[in-house]
Amino acid sequence: MEQKLHLIPYQVNEMVEVVEVVPKGIELIAAPKVWENSKGKGITVAILDTGCDVTHPDLSERIIGGRNFTGDDDGQPDVYIDYNGHGTHVAGTIAAINNGTGVVGVAPEASLLIL
């Protein structure tokens, strides 16, 4: 059976990018108040998840290393690319830096070990 596809044209009126530098969840746990005493400097947090986007501008400075324990990328231990996005999100929630390009994490000066 042949079907006809009808496309409705659209026009972009305006483009809006809304980014909260300090996400609501970070505010809700009062992290900005804790930053008066510590932003996580000297602390390493291991992220055991789906990997991490090591080129992400909010994370690349925080990542000190990692290890791939999966069969992804032919099991290469030093390649821990995130093909899912969840591990990158978790890493950002924990330690995204406050660089004005995205959001800030709970401990923006902590180091990340991606597992």
Regions found by a protein language model. Name each.
Residues 3-111:
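Active-site core segment of subtilase-fold serine proteases
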